[in-house]
Amino acid sequence: MPKVSIVEKSQFFAKAVVEGVPPSLINSLRRVIISELPVLAIDSVVVVNNTSVMYDEMLAHRLGLIPLTTPLKDLPPIEDCESGLVDPSECTVRLTLQVNATGDVVVYAGDLVADRPDVAPVYKDIPIVKLVEGQSVVVEAYAKLGRARDHAKWQAALASYYYYPKVVVKREECREMCKEVCRNLENPLECTFNKATTCKEMCGGGIVVEWEKDKYVFWIESFGNYDAETALREAFRILKKKFEDFLDALSRKAEAKL
């Protein structure tokens, strides 16, 4: 029976011990989190005026890499946006950037203004370009829902896991030898499998390192587009839909042979 124990949780980070699931399933979840989660990112830019020293192309590139808050519950499912089931405007948000320098000034991500109040740069202090007196930047940008499998600017989070290690200390002097690498050898959350293996190599046969089958330490960290819990829920939704689509395709194939 699958079991999950939360070890650490904050707005943008979560760590848990997961038991009773095969590695293929937990790895599928990891891959969905890394490459399939939808987020808003600037995808097209209209440069109205740019008298800064930065080329228009470089300016557009920088704007595209600024993470934006993404209110998933108020946006269509990414599948509907990709398939054209909804109007493209429902999957797009317009942003403007207008800065006229009256002295030396730095243009920041926080100067971007979206048409929607629930969409804004996650980190407002990201510098975009420097201006001197008399220079200006006026830009109209369009952010759309996308996935990291198409471009890294649409990546919402990182996720990883490692097997739950089981460490047996046969010689007490090994604890002192491994103190700098791992202070508590028997604590799998503090002493990861890699750290335990390093200690094993340092101490020879004084430490035995194994792992528990179908038990892992899993963590996820959001880039701030939405919180870690939302990222996990969306990842499970996408993974479930993939299974459903696979079963539907399999059923149609079987029916066609009858």
UniProtKB/Swiss-Prot annotation:
Reaction(s) catalysed by this chain's protein: RNA(n) + a ribonucleoside 5'-triphosphate = RNA(n+1) + diphosphate
Q: Which UniProt keywords apply?
A: Cytoplasm, DNA-directed RNA polymerase, Nucleotidyltransferase, Transcription, Transferase
Tell me which GO cellular component terms the UniProt record holds.
cytoplasm; DNA-directed RNA polymerase complex
Q: Name one Pfam family in it.
A: RNA_pol_A_bac
Q: According to the UniProt entry, what is the EC number of this protein?
A: 2.7.7.6
Example GO biological process: DNA-templated transcription
Kindly give the SMART domains that the UniProt entry links to this protein: RPOLD
Q: What class of enzyme is it?
A: transferase
The record, for HAMAP family, names: RNApol_arch_Rpo3
Query: Which family does the similarity line name?
Result: Belongs to the archaeal Rpo3/eukaryotic RPB3 RNA polymerase subunit family.
Question: What's the stated role of this polypeptide?
Answer: DNA-dependent RNA polymerase (RNAP) catalyzes the transcription of DNA into RNA using the four ribonucleoside triphosphates as substrates.
Q: What is this protein called?
A: DNA-directed RNA polymerase subunit Rpo3
The species this protein belongs to is Pyrobaculum calidifontis (strain DSM 21063 / JCM 11548 / VA1)
Give the gene that encodes this protein. Answer: rpo3
